[in-house]
């Protein structure tokens, strides 16, 4: 459906987005980024929807990646986004808010924020939200994502943990960190809701509280004038929460590149020559470009990285099975 939308936008002479939907695509195939892997985890994926599949997938050898890149080239040739997108300094929301693009991909909360801004400034646009992978169960991030770590050299690790527990479990402290000062930045509505008074100087839910999110005590925002977009956001969020996938052991795995630091640095130095043009369809010949990327990655040492990753993953899985 997303591809049909992009093609329809191009046919109508409007840019569909500010680049290719690489994340929604590999997620639609059941895959996720691998923690600690090159290119922010995007170069090596794992099949998060299948807990029995313990193979890592280097995208250069993935047929689906080749097919995706060809489809992106077809979309660019059709005019689905600018051929100059890699040189643009626009932020991700710029295209939507200025009307230069018909969509924006981001997390739920950010899509709500900019969708509401677009509708307030241009009511006739009727911006809405969709989940392009609504049929897939959802991955829940582990606490190593947006979490807070205690330094291994801390002299009082237990005391540090007590502080974090206070932020995580004390409703008053939780409200302060998330919402700011009651009566200045926000006011309570009942026992479990809040209303924004003034976000200047302290953006609600946009600060350190990401490190100890706790939905059991977190207040929901009270909206006096609900919009269709608010309702859509709630329905998608509820659908997410009611469709959590089974854990994959690699959901908590994080690759340590120390033993292959030279190869890792070489891969990172070379990948941008190929990766960004490919995932945005900005190459003349997809097959030739992927072959060139693979040759560069082989020369940089991608196989050494994969071998070390498989070794660490095997140890990680064995350790988990013992517990």
Where are these regions (language model features)?
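Extracytoplasmic/secretory soluble proteins
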Residues: 1-323
